[in-house]
Amino acid sequence: SGGMQKRLSIACALASRPTLLLLDEPDAALDLVCKEDIREYIRLYCAQGNTVLLATHEEADFDLCSKLILLKDGQARTLAADTPVKEIIEYLS
């Protein structure tokens, strides 16, 4: 399944114990259970003092982040992770 392939890909990436993990849409096209599994892996990895650079379109992934960098029309804007979602959506609109 797609969920199993994503989990296996992340497990392979983590096998070498990197301190920085780059993830591009790690939970794209997955069902809700698989998405939450992937998010939990990311939470645990970060809790161990590691860094994740995560590209996502999923609002639900924002809570995984300590800092958000939003891209719009080729411009980047950095926000704190606790920025209200309404403000984020207004910026992106």
Question: Which residues make up each language-model segment?
Answer:
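Catalytic Walker B motif of ABC-type/P-loop ATPase nucleotide-binding domains
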Residues: 21-24
